[in-house]
Each structure stands twice: as C-alpha cells, then as structure tokens.
C-alpha cells in the first residue's frame, strides 16, 4: 500500500468489517455498506486522477507492476525468446526474441525485473550488464537484416553500475547501442512501462516513437539522486520529482514522449490484460504509420526526432 492510497484502504477495511458483522450477527447493514462503497468509488476516482509526480514514481516502482514478460504474450503471437550476446553470457535482466504483431514478424527487446526476491536476484533487479545491451543490439541488427520492425520495453532503474560490469565495458555497450540504433533502417518503437532510468533506459530508447504508460517515469537520474546532488538531501526527492519533469504527461508536453497510454484506474497492475491490449492497439497504430516510410526516411525521422528535443538560446 502506497502512502496516498491509505485513505482508500481505510474505507475498504470499514466495508469488510461491516460485511463480516452483517454475516456474523445476522443484521442488515447493507445501507451503510452501499454508502461506503459509493464513497470508495468517489475517493478512488479523486485520488488516481490527481496524482502528484512523486505518487507516479511510487506506482512506477511497484513490485506488482507488470513487467515486459507480463505484456509480451498478450501483445505478440508465437513469441520465441532468444539468448546470449555471442561474446560473454546471457543476461537475464535483458530479454529479447521474435514474434508476430498482426501477422507481421517483429523483434522484441526489453529490460526485465523480477516478480519476487528470488527472481529479482536472478534478473539483477532489471539492471542489465554490458552483455545485456550487446544481446539487445545483436537482436536489433538481426531484425534489420531480415527487415523486421523492433519494439523495445524500457523498465529499469539504470544499467548495472558494478565493478565487473564496468570492466566489461558498460559505458561502451550503451554508447554502441545509441550509435547503432540511430541508423537502423527498420521501424523502431519503444515504450516506458515502469521506470526509465538514466543511460540504462536510453540504451533501448533511440527510437522513431517513444511511448509511455500513464504512470511511468523517464529521467536521467532518480529523484533521490537528484535531490542529493542538488541540495545535499535525498529527503527532498518529492520536490525533485516535480522539478525534474519526469512523468509521462510532462514528457509529452515537452515533445519527448510521442503518446501517453492510459492505465486502468489504480495502475496497470489492476488489469494486465486490458493494459496489454491498449499497448497493442497503440503499437499497431504507430507501426502502420512507420511502415509507410522508406529506409532512408525512417533513419531521417529518428534523427530529426532527437535533434528537435530540448530548447536553447543564442
């Protein structure tokens, strides 16, 4: 339960208590229950339609939030996962493979968090090593060779900053992805489904279209990290979250995100199937547009997208 959800849980507990009392004592409390349920519906709508940036950060980080592998089977047909970077090892924090979207063969890559403690240790909490980024690039270059569109799922706090990862060329692997993705001659679409953190997210983010789920975030650093650097106090993360403009709505207004995909009330974890179908429809719409472009136009479209991000004064 998140802090901003506490009032809702208090009402839910009262409803459950009344229902138990009604059943146990054989008394009619239905009128009170109906009133509380109506109140819960109103409060739920009020809470989730007025979320602050820090609230969305908390939702993006939820353990229960759907991961790449939760969405993929609902969106792509006959998905087959492929493994390894053909150099060092297979990185479980980065998944990828091939499947079909409306009969068209596509390549899918994405960061993968764990669903529980054991799985998170196996997946390294979604923080990929260099071999993860090299695996993703191998699959993207394969997609280019066979003229398959690419879909990337961004969901990471950042690339793994450990000593071994740095020794194996973490920064080089991400930089290589940026260079190579910029010149891919097939449609490339990314979606931020949770946290999109730092260069670890950008390593899958040089795409023709950047989509974001309503409660996802995309930033160069976490709010805690930003507040510690700027104000020497990580407790000011709430203020940093507002200042940094990291929410989907903010990034859409800044022309960084191309579309914000609505989530079920309360977050994507409340209805994975509905959320997946919404993502699928959005993928189909953007892919239909990009399929009309030539290879040269796709590269130019991607180039212009990133050239026009941001503002400057002379």
Curated annotation (Swiss-Prot):
Residues 32-289 form the CoA carboxyltransferase C-terminal domain. It is found in: Cytoplasm. InterPro entries: Acetyl_CoA_COase_a_su, ClpP/crotonase-like_dom_sf, COA_CT_C. GO terms for cellular component: acetyl-CoA carboxylase complex. It holds the Pfam family ACCA. This is Acetyl-coenzyme A carboxylase carboxyl transferase subunit alpha. It is an enzyme of class 2 (transferase). Its main location: cytoplasm. GO terms for biological process: fatty acid biosynthetic process; malonyl-CoA biosynthetic process. Gene3D superfamilies: 2-enoyl-CoA Hydratase, Chain A, domain 1 (3.90.226.10). GO terms for molecular function: acetyl-CoA carboxylase activity; ATP binding; carboxyl- or carbamoyltransferase activity. Pathway: Lipid metabolism; malonyl-CoA biosynthesis; malonyl-CoA from acetyl-CoA: step 1/1. Acetyl-CoA carboxylase is a heterohexamer composed of biotin carboxyl carrier protein (AccB), biotin carboxylase (AccC) and two subunits each of ACCase subunit alpha (AccA) and ACCase subunit beta (AccD). Component of the acetyl coenzyme A carboxylase (ACC) complex. First, biotin carboxylase catalyzes the carboxylation of biotin on its carrier protein (BCCP) and then the CO(2) group is transferred by the carboxyltransferase to acetyl-CoA to form malonyl-CoA. Keywords: ATP-binding, Cytoplasm, Fatty acid biosynthesis, Fatty acid metabolism, Lipid biosynthesis, Lipid metabolism, Nucleotide-binding, Transferase. Its EC number is 2.1.3.15. It catalyses: N(6)-carboxybiotinyl-L-lysyl-[protein] + acetyl-CoA = N(6)-biotinyl-L-lysyl-[protein] + malonyl-CoA. Belongs to the AccA family.
């Amino acid at each position: 339960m998140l802090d901003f959800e506490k009032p809702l849980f208090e009402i839910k507990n009262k409803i459950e208590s009344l229902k138990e009392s009604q059943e146990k004592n054989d008394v009619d409390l239905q009128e009170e229950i109906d009133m509380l349920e109506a109140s819960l519906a109103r409060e739920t709508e009020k809470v989730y339609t007025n979320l602050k940036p820090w609230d969305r950060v908390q939702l993006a980080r939820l353990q229960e939030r759907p991961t790449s592998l939760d969405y993929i089977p609902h969106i792509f047909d006959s998905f087959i996962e492929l493994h390894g970077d053909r150099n060092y090892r297979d990185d479980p924090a980065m998944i990828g493979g091939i499947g079909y979207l409306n009969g068209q063969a596509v390549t899918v890559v994405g960061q993968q968090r764990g669903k529980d403690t054991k799985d998170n240790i196996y997946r390294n909490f979604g923080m990929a090593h260099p071999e993860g980024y090299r695996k993703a690039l191998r699959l993207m270059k394969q997609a280019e060779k066979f003229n398959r569109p690419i879909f990337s799922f961004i969901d990471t706090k950042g690339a793994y900053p450990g000593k071994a990862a740095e020794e194996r060329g973490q920064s080089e692997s991400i930089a290589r992805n940026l260079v190579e993705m910029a010149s891919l001659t097939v449609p490339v679409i990314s979606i931020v489904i949770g946290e999109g953190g730092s260069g670890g997210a950008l390593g899958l983010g040089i795409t023709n279209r950047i989509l974001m789920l309503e409660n996802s975030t995309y930033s160069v650093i976490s709010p805690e990290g930003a507040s510690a650097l700027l104000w020497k106090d990580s407790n000011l993360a709430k203020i940093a979250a507002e200042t940094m403009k990291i929410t989907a709505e903010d990034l859409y207004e800044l022309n960084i995100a191309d579309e914000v995909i609505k989530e079920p009330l309360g977050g994507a974890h409340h209805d994975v199937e509905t959320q997946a179908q919404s993502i699928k429809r959005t993928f189909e719409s953007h892919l239909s547009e990009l399929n009309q472009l030539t290879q040269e136009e796709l590269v130019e479209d991607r180039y212009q997208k990133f050239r026009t991000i941001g503002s400057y004064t002379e």
